Design a protein with these regions (language model features):
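Extended amphipathic alpha-helical interaction segments
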Residues: 159-287, 294
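N-terminal Sec/ER secretory leader and immediately downstream segment
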Residues: 48-158
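Short, solvent-exposed secondary-structure capping/transition elements
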Residues: 119-133, 153, 175, 205, ...
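N-terminal positive-inside, membrane-proximal cytosolic segments immediately preceding the first
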Residues: 1-22
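Long, amphipathic, charge-rich alpha-helical segments that form helical bundles/coiled-coils
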Residues: 136-173, 282-307
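A cross-kingdom marker for long, charged
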Residues: 40-42, 47-56, 250, 256-339
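A cross-kingdom feature marking solvent-exposed beta-strand/loop segments within repeated
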Residues: 91-101, 150, 236-246, 299-317
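Hydrophobic membrane-insertion alpha-helices, especially the h-region
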Residues: 21-35
């Protein structure tokens, strides 16, 4: 009987050892996943136009009109794919599966990349409305519009395809016999900035709705003959759900990060146009407002205090910078429209 008791105690000790090892391993896994998630959630650093050209452009590419803009688009795409942790929006395993700040940041940057790719295909690479689309941009633009959350076939493979096509277009820009062009004209720039203006306006409204706003319906304002599909209410309260506040914040942060790089490149490519319209300072003001959105967030979480409350409201601060950039874009488009 004594031997049987010893045997049972030995078995229990063995089981306890295995349980302790399992619990310890799980705790170490969680700790490692948390630390890795924190590292992966750090936004990429800003880069200057010359640094981007040195990384992604051909030799002496800065001398060719269009290379700064195309190099920046390639840089944004490659950053999404090659930053620490890689592309996270379609991850199906921890720790990427548990993260949401960086995937929202990625989506904001991706939207700006898509808008620029569409502008390149639709306007910037074409001299007239009936001119032929560039073959490489025909591939790149839809490739960037592939579903960002798809795991199979992976979004990464489609975005790498877009990057390769953009690289081919960029090389051809410096080869006159290849027929690739980027036309730095005021009307082309105005068309692109119109898309930027609507994107920033939407982000500003979504950020401002973090505290809830009572808004009058101005959908048909200014046109007495205008109609819409369904009858809208005259006034409504718009408020971003509490669990989506940080999502909107980081989407705006990623969008602003990508856009400020694009506008720096546009300042280089469209320098003569901006000087002719006396609009360079206006563009610099937009860039400065966007740079302010990239300041370090010292709080461990995005706070949502009331407008004049005790606690900060990070969304309203971000909305302020985005709204000023939006207003400056509107002024810039007006300057470009002048003769």
């Amino acid at each position: 009987m004594l031997g049987s008791l010893k045997s049972r105690l030995t078995n229990l000790e063995g089981q306890s050892t295995w349980i302790a090892a399992g619990v310890g391993g799980f705790v170490l896994f969680l700790l490692g996943a948390v630390l890795l998630g924190i590292h992966w959630s750090q936004p990429p650093e800003q880069r200057g136009v010359d640094d981007i050209l040195a990384k992604t452009g051909p030799v002496d590419s800065g001398a060719t009109i269009g290379n700064p803009t195309v190099s920046t688009l390639i840089f944004i795409t490659q950053t999404l794919l090659e930053k620490p942790g890689g592309y996270l929006s379609n991850d199906v395993t921890p720790p990427g599966l548990w993260l949401d700040n960086m995937p929202n940041w990625e989506f904001g940057a991706l939207v700006q990349a898509r808008d620029l790719a569409r502008a390149l295909r639709k306007d910037l690479s074409r001299s007239q409305s009936q001119s032929t689309e560039d073959a490489d941009l025909v591939v790149a633009e839809p490739a960037l519009n592939y579903d960002s959350s798809k795991w199979f076939p992976s979004a990464e493979s489609s975005y790498y395809k877009a990057s390769n096509s953009l690289n081919s277009y960029q090389i051809r820009l410096a080869m006159p016999e290849e027929g690739a062009q980027l036309y730095a004209r005021a009307d082309n720039l105005r068309n692109y900035l119109a898309d930027v203006e609507t994107r920033l306006g939407s982000l500003s409204q979504r950020l401002s709705a973090s505290v809830g706003q009572a808004r009058f319906n101005t959908d048909l304002a200014g046109d007495p003959a205008a109609t819409q599909s369904t009858i809208g209410v005259s006034e409504r309260v718009i408020k971003t759900p509490w669990f989506e506040i940080d999502d909107v914040f980081y989407e705006a942060r990623g969008s602003a990060w990508a856009l400020l790089h694009i506008l720096r490149a546009i300042e280089r490519d469209f320098g003569s146009v901006l000087e002719n319209k006396n609009a360079r300072v206006s563009l610099k003001q937009v860039i400065r407002e966007l740079e302010a959105t990239q300041q370090t967030v010292w709080s461990p979480m995005i706070l949502n205090g009331s407008g004049f409350g005790v606690f900060a409201n990070h969304s309203l601060v971000m909305a302020s910078y985005i709204a000023r950039a939006h207003a400056a874009i509107s002024d810039l488009r007006a300057l470009l429209a002048q003769g």
